[in-house]
């Protein structure tokens, strides 16, 4: 909330801006905390999903809620673990005012990650790009999106949600803001290797036809070899 007040004081955003929390079906007291914030200050609002539908669907739910509210010009998505620098929002909004419809938050380095996390994460980006997915290196889901982009994005009916690759497909002018990633405020990452692999699979199958070509080629080769024998 302090960040909204700061942006408002600089004349970058309206005082009507809001902080929207998305509760992804958590079983702890997260939703109670969100309701408490909303009861204390009108700048806080929240939505709660009936069950855990995954990080990407939670982000999408927040974006669509913001779009359908009909009151915002831009939406900035950010995780609540404290690792993404909220001060990067100032530059994001400035770049939007300069004409960018999408502004990607990009980590300048990954010093706070373990070697294994850094190795697998960077490998993920390289593999996705090699398979033809147009994603921004070291960008996760910290980004500014204009309502104009969200309106076009809402037309996508993907089953496997992979926002890092889907947003660039919409087009529109874009820019990048780099920032240093912080340590987590609490808890542990909910993106172990298994979830990263699942995310990679969703991204590959929804954004690239290269796996289909590879599989088709393998099937054709097997079929030919079977006939030869």
Protein language model annotation of sequence segments:
Residues 2-15:
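Short, acidic, metal-binding catalytic loop of nucleotide-sugar glycosyltransferases
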Residues 222-229:
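Conserved small/polar residues in nucleotide/adenosyl-binding loops
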Residues 204, 209-221:
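Alpha-helical segments in transporter systems
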Residues 23-31, 82-83:
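A conserved acidic beta->alpha catalytic loop
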Residues 13-25, 48:
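Short beta-strand/loop segment that forms part of the nucleotide-sugar
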Residues 175-181:
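Catalytic beta-strand/loop signature of glycosyltransferases that borders the donor
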């Amino acid at each position: 909330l302090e960040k909204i007040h700061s942006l408002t004081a600089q004349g970058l955003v309206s005082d009507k801006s809001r902080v929207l929390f998305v509760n992804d079906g958590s079983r702890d007291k997260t939703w109670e905390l969100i309701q408490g914030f909303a009861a204390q200050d009108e700048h806080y609002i929240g939505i709660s999903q009936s069950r855990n539908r995954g990080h990407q669907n939670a982000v999408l739910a927040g974006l669509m809620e913001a779009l359908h509210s009909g009151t915002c010009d831009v939406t900035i998505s950010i995780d609540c673990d404290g690792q993404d620098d909220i001060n990067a929002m100032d530059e994001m909004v400035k770049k939007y005012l300069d004409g960018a419809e999408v502004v990607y938050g990009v980590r300048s380095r990954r010093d706070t990650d373990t070697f294994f996390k850094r190795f697998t994460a960077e490998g993920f980006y390289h593999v996705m790009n090699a398979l033809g997915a147009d994603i921004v290196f070291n960008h996760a889901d910290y980004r500014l999106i204009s309502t104009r982009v969200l309106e076009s994005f809402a037309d996508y009916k993907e089953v496997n949600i992979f926002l890092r690759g889907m947003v660039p497909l919409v087009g529109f002018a874009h820019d990048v803001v780099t920032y240093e990633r912080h340590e987590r405020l609490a808890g542990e990452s909910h993106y172990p290797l298994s979830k990263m692999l699942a995310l990679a699979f969703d991204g590959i199958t929804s954004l690239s036809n290269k796996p289909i070509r590879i599989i088709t080629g393998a099937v054709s080769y097997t079929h030919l070899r079977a006939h030869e024998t």
